A protein has these predicted regions:
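Structural motif
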Residues: 88, 120, 146-149, 246
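Non-catalytic interfacial helical region
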Residues: 108-112, 134-147, 151, 159, ...
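A secondary-structure boundary/capping signal
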Residues: 11, 38, 133, 160-161, ...
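C-terminal accessory "lid"/substrate-recognition subdomains
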Residues: 2, 149, 156, 165-323, ...
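Small/polar loops that bind or transfer phosphate-bearing groups
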Residues: 39, 71, 98, 161, ...
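Nucleotide-state-sensitive switch-loop elements of NTP-binding domains
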Residues: 2-140
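Short secondary-structure boundary/capping segments
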Residues: 51, 120-121, 148-149, 316-317
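Conserved beta-strand/loop subsegment of P-loop NTPase cores
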Residues: 36-38, 92-97, 121-132, 151-162, ...
């Protein structure tokens, strides 16, 4: 069965980080395909007028075939209206990009995509992209906890304006971002160029995802091998030691690899307990889960109290039945999160 849902990419980043430059690059590129970009306000979007074919009060059509619209009412209504006009043949699009305002917490937007029945049936989360200004990244992270949260839950971080700062400053900023989000891929971009294909297909929340895609999304493309990290009481080696800013201290993350499939009831009890106690502080949970008695694994993904329906991966090679689970949370320390995850290991062989 072909998954016909439209992929949605969430684009976050603070004012001045370079989101507009990136959007204009996407909208100008004829190889992008037909993309519908949703912005908060046209006046704030900074669209390049040389790229505009025609515009109305609600929609701007770009020369590349892409379109841009502003939020009218709530987000679910805006996306539903796009689909209605697509069905009527008025517009055409193959994917959606939602640009958040600088201060926006991405969590509620992701939850909307999960809980709205129409959106859940017609769209799927394709990835969270966060743009970080290399020139002002440190000061923004120091002053705005929302910026820290945006970096912590990203699937991909784009460092903009890297031509304006030294290599050593870039490396320090990368280290700080990786301390917040150890599995994230970080790439550099100047003026948003050459990124189009990199932005898409970040998530494994579809049944056609390959094993490598699922692993890249869950544990990162370049995980560092830590021989003791999968044993209780041992943590991965720390990266370059830097003073930890106060906002960063509020973010905790932990992961676990389980060698054997676990009972479904054990996972359900663990997750229900975690959500009941600290659900509002869970920024993101994602993972690959093997359940006893079922050959193919499930991809799981949730934000706070809300979770996607699990997606079973059909293209998983037999033999590897290890579950991988990652949690990112605020106001929970890494040891606290790790202790919670270790409850799954306790029942792994029951």
């Amino acid at each position: 069965m072909i998954d016909t849902r439209v992929p949605i990419t969430l684009l976050t980043g603070f004012l001045g980080a370079g989101k507009t430059t990136l959007l204009n690059s996407v909208l100008a590129n004829n190889s992008t395909g037909r993309v519908a970009v949703i912005v908060n306000e046209f006046g704030e979007a900074g669209l390049d007028h040389d790229l505009i074919e025609k515009s109305s009060e609600e929609i701007v059509l770009m020369r590349s075939g892409c379109l841009c619209c502003s939020v009218r009412g709530d987000l679910s209504e805006t996306i539903s209206n796009l689909f209605r006009r697509k069905i009527l043949g008025e517009i055409s699009f193959e994917r959606i990009v939602i640009e958040t305002t600088g201060l926006a917490d991405p969590g509620p937007i992701i939850q909307t995509l999960f809980v709205d029945l129409f959106l859940a049936n017609n769209t799927r989360m394709d990835g969270i992209v966060t743009v970080v200004d290399a020139a002002n990244g440190f000061s923004t992270l120091d002053s705005q906890f929302e910026a820290v949260s945006q970096a912590a839950i990203a699937d991909l971080i784009i460092l903009s304006k890297t031509d304006l700062v030294s290599h050593s400053k870039i490396k320090k900023l990368e280290t700080r971002l990786q301390n917040l989000n150890s599995n994230v891929e970080i790439i550099h971009s100047i003026f948003g160029e050459g990124l189009n294909e990199t932005l898409w297909g970040l998530s494994a929340l579809h049944e056609k995802a390959t094993k490598n895609q699922a692993l890249d999304w869950t544990i990162g493309k370049h995980p560092k091998f830590e021989p003791l990290s999968n044993l209780s009481g041992f943590s991965p080696a720390k990266k370059l030691s830097l003073p930890t800013p106060s906002h960063d201290l509020r973010i905790g993350s932990a992961s676990i690899i389980l060698e054997n499939p676990i009972p479904e009831a054990v996972f359900d009890i663990w997750l229900d307990t975690l959500i009941a106690i600290r659900g509002s502080d869970i920024l993101r949970i994602k993972g690959i889960l093997f359940i006893e008695g079922i050959d193919a694994p499930f991809v799981i993904h949730g934000v706070q109290h809300i979770f996607n329906p699990p997606v079973q991966l059909k293209n998983w090679n037999k033999g590897d039945q290890r579950s991988r689970i990652v949690i990112i949370a605020r106001d929970l320390t890494r040891p606290e999160l790790q202790r919670s995850l270790e409850m799954l290991r306790t029942h792994e062989n029951e």
